[in-house]
């Protein structure tokens, strides 16, 4: 089956109860980029990519649209299958995984619909009918972080990510301590996420002053080299997030025992095809990981849920979705929802969504 047409859209996603605060800045509203692939037989596949602003990573909404215009212009008539698609995309544009991810998701959605099976079957098959999610507490005052931590634990979340950084390290230490005091004894897991916001000095101080708190340190510093520097001196397990930009980087980090796990985003690694390889590599190395994305609506949330359902449960650290911060669903009936800290795995064909073809207005680009 070949691609007949690709249409590109953009859509605003205001942050519910904003801002969402991380070390790189405050987020009030984001622009998501939507891909619609139409096959020769009229089957439609949807994809999506939504960077968290221009400073979180080397990605932004304007760049996504520009890259997708280049890719879409060269994909008419191409095979609508993941491997041929990636081969063709790589011949058209170097890098830009976050843009390629949207096309990858759309092709998986298209083929699932064509075959009448959910995307998770194309990825090897679901191991569960619901996936654990985790809640991310933005950078906030320590007392408020503790209050929200207990609230989310009572809602059913089994893991909390505490956003830290871009302020005195003493406040971050106070925040993680108060969060731990609030949820201690509940069995909830904690991740202290610096989002690249700490110096190596502050990351080491944070770990040394909290040896009694069982958290993992997620991407505390800015670079691969920073992680190498602090690794032998840390008192806590170390996870890679933003630096995990490719399969090659992941393989190197695991082979050198640099990290104990990963926070991985579908868009960062280039889509479900590459995420599947990442999943299998982590299973071979017995490394836990998440299945997330930076931001977005139902389309990218469904993609994350499908791949998360195929991960060995003992290695699955949860799927983070922006859904609690997004006011609307693209599909009011089948939109992805977090309930009791878990996400039901969609069972309909493709991503399991039924989206009105006119939902996002006229396309900004078509090829």
Curated annotation (Swiss-Prot):
GO terms for biological process: amino-acid betaine catabolic process. Catalyzes the 2-epimerization of trans-4-hydroxy-L-proline betaine (tHyp-B) to cis-4-hydroxy-D-proline betaine (cHyp-B). Is involved in a catabolic pathway that degrades tHyp-B to alpha-ketoglutarate. This pathway would permit the utilization of tHyp-B as a carbon and nitrogen source in the absence of osmotic stress, since tHyp-B functions as an osmolyte and is not catabolized when it is needed as osmoprotectant. To a lesser extent, can also catalyze the racemization of L-proline betaine. SUPFAM superfamilies: Enolase C-terminal domain-like (SSF51604), Enolase N-terminal domain-like (SSF54826). The active site is at 163 (proton donor/acceptor), 265 (proton donor/acceptor). This is 4-hydroxyproline betaine 2-epimerase. GO terms for molecular function: amino-acid racemase activity; magnesium ion binding; racemase and epimerase activity, acting on amino acids and derivatives. It comes from the Bacteria. SMART domains: MR_MLE. Its EC number is 5.1.1.22. It comes from Salipiger bermudensis (strain DSM 26914 / JCM 13377 / KCTC 12554 / HTCC2601) (Pelagibaca bermudensis). InterPro entries: 4R-hPro_betaine_2-epimerase, DgoD-like, Enolase-like_C_sf, Enolase-like_N, Enolase_C-like, Mandelate_racemase_C, Mandelate_racemase_N_dom. Disulfide bonds: none annotated. Keywords: Isomerase, Magnesium, Metal-binding. The keyword Calcium does not apply. The keyword NAD does not apply. The lineage of its organism: Bacteria, Pseudomonadati, Pseudomonadota, Alphaproteobacteria, Rhodobacterales. Belongs to the mandelate racemase/muconate lactonizing enzyme family.
